[in-house]
């Protein structure tokens, strides 16, 4: 049964959201401490440091209260919360834990210095949020949906000293949509999960491919994977190229993809999925789209063979490989190029893209590190592109709530 949203209260929900963002660290620390005190298994599942845990907590709650302030459609808001609950089943907690979890959330409100009326109304909304998430988690349990899967590494390639391409296999089909991402961890990362976009569409053998850029200790460990390693992978999440799962010229949409670094991964999965669908239907692939892949230098472009093949297969696809510099860093250690590709040097890829796509592009899809995606989104908005025509896919989970 779907939880009913509580009756409207006199509350400045926008002020609650603002207070959460302003006092994010204090709130997260308080909730973290309450979780450790009241839910003992949490000590084995989350990092001891509050700074390393629950990165998505405050942005998600702030987004929720902003939706309340805007009187957003209930179904839209609750769908996001339900997806979050289903994905968090990977931690192994039963749905009943939300009863305790919401008390931790409510206790943390004291750090926000809210008006009494706002605090009371916010607490009621948090209890509603917990019921929605508990119902979604319980429904997934009753449906027999696995909260996570164990996969084994079957292939590793390191095209340069910063990027690793890791292939895993479950041995059984893994259901997901091209462009979705997964939370992953290994025994070397106790309590730490990283979100990675699948770089290829699903296969009958349950294979997954991830492109990992080593930016910190966790991603460096994942990039250093060896064949035979076991990874734990959560449920797929997100939606890429919304409404374009069977994109063709007939749908009247011309997508323009802007990928920064390994932000190419979800775009790659989506494009290959369209090719697979066309072949399965006995048709020649013909994807109308412009694709801009941005990297610091030519050696950072690690997937040029697939990019060239996609461009060759699809006459109406325009593939642009952009670089900040024409020269590779001395210690990049990039593989020798297998094919010759033209790289364009551009200090401002968004402006270059806009110059070329003024008459064609009407859906801009941004993928990559959160800062680059946020900057690109701001440039597009400043140039007059409507917000509804921009789809952002930032790498970190907090960014998912900030940009969408």
Regions found by a protein language model. Give the residues of each.
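Reductase modules of NAD(P)H-dependent flavoproteins
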Residues: 19, 290-404
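Phosphate- and divalent-cation-binding pockets in alpha/beta enzyme and binding domains
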Residues: 221, 266-269, 375-376
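Core of compact, soluble alpha-helical bundle domains
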Residues: 1-149
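A short, basic/flexible loop-to-alpha-helix module at the beginning of a structural domain
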Residues: 236-250
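Short, conserved phosphate/pyrophosphate- and ester-handling motifs at nucleotide-, phospho-/glycolipid
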Residues: 179, 263, 369
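Ferredoxin-reductase
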Residues: 146-234, 255, 295-296, 323-326
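Phosphate-binding glycine-rich loops and their immediate beta-loop-alpha structural context
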Residues: 257-278
């Amino acid at each position: 049964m779907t939880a009913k949203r509580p009756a409207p209260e006199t509350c400045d929900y926008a002020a609650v959201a603002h207070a959460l963002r302003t006092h994010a660290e204090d709130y997260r620390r308080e909730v973290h401490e309450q979780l450790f005190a009241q839910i003992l298994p949490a000590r084995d599942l989350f990092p001891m440091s509050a700074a390393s845990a629950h990165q998505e907590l405050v942005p998600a709650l702030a987004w929720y209260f902003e939706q309340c302030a805007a009187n957003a459609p209930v179904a839209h808001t609750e769908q996001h919360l339900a997806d979050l609950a289903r994905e968090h089943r990977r931690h192994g907690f039963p749905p009943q834990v939300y009863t305790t979890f919401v008390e931790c959330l409510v206790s943390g409100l004291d750090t926000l210095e809210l008006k009494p009326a706002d605090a009371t109304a916010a607490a009621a909304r948090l209890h509603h949020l917990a019921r929605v998430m508990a119902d979604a988690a319980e429904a997934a349990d009753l449906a027999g949906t696995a909260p996570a899967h164990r996969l084994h590494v079957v292939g590793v390639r390191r095209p340069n000293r910063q990027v690793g391409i890791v292939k895993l296999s479950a041995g059984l089909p893994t259901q997901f949509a091209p462009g979705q991402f997964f939370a992953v961890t290994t025994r070397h990362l106790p309590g730490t999960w990283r979100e990675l976009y699948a770089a290829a569409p699903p296969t009958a053998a349950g294979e997954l491919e991830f492109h990992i850029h080593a930016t910190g200790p966790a991603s460096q460990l994942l990039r250093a994977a060896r064949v035979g390693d076991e990874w734990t992978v959560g449920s797929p999440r997100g939606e890429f190229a919304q409404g374009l799962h069977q994109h063709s010229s007939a749908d009247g949409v011309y997508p323009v993809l802007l990928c920064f670094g390994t932000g190419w991964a979800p775009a790659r999965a989506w494009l290959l999925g369209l090719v697979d669908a066309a072949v399965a239907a006995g048709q020649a692939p013909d994807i109308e789209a412009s694709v801009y892949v941005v990297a610091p230098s030519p050696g950072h472009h690690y997937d040029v063979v697939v990019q060239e093949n996609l461009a060759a297969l699809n006459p109406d696809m325009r593939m642009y490989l952009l670089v900040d510099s024409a020269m590779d860093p001395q210690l990049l250690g990039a593989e020798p190029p297998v094919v010759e590709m033209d790289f364009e040097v551009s200090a401002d890829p968004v402006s270059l893209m806009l110059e070329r796509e003024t008459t064609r592009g009407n859906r801009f899809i941004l993928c990559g590190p959160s800062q680059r995606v946020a900057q690109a989104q701001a440039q597009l908005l400043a140039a007059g592109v409507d917000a509804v025509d921009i789809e952002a896919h930032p790498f970190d989970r907090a960014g998912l709530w900030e940009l969408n």
